[in-house]
A protein has these predicted regions:
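Charged, low-complexity intrinsically disordered terminal regions and linker tails
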Residues: 1-4, 9-12, 40-147
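N-terminal leader/targeting peptides and immediately adjacent processing regions
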Residues: 1-32
């Protein structure tokens, strides 16, 4: 199962997308916003998304495990599992991770990570008055949103 990007994400980032090396950059920014919002999720129909890749691309490849760890920590907290409950933590990890897949995420894990990215996009569009016009101003405001 691939990483998926909401179709409206491309339009919203259109003025700064030239500054991105990969389309995955947009996905990652939305994911971080969703994680910062406590794992905020949105359900989006597959027809309203585009397929990106099924593995962490480019420079994200070496950071994939860290990204997954942030996702797992957020999910464990979101569902209210105590970090001291090793059995419940391990079950959550088993449900979301599959080391045999290119992304290292299970189908459920990928679906949930995509939903967090969609929710992060919602959070960004709510926080910004208008779509970003320059990368510099976007990053200043983005940093305020995620901290």
């Amino acid at each position: 199962m691939p990483f998926r990007l909401r179709r409206d994400t491309r339009k919203w980032f259109q003025d700064i997308s030239k500054d991105f090396e990969l389309d995955f950059d947009m996905y990652y920014l939305c994911l971080v916003a969703g994680l910062a919002a406590g794992g905020r999720r949105s359900e989006v129909k597959a027809s309203d998304t585009t397929e990106l890749v099924d593995t962490f691309p480019g420079s994200y490849r070496e950071k994939g495990r860290t990204i997954i760890a942030l996702f797992l920590a957020t999910e464990i907290e979101r569902v209210g599992i105590s970090k001291d409950d090793r059995e419940a933590v391990h079950k959550q990890i088993r449900d979301l991770v599959d080391p045999r897949t290119p992304s290292q995420l299970s189908e459920i894990g990928m679906r949930q990570m995509n939903q967090v990215s969609y929710g992060g996009f919602d959070a960004l569009t709510e926080e910004f008055d208008d779509r970003p016009r320059s990368l510099e101003s976007f990053l200043v405001n983005f940093q305020k949103i995620i901290t």
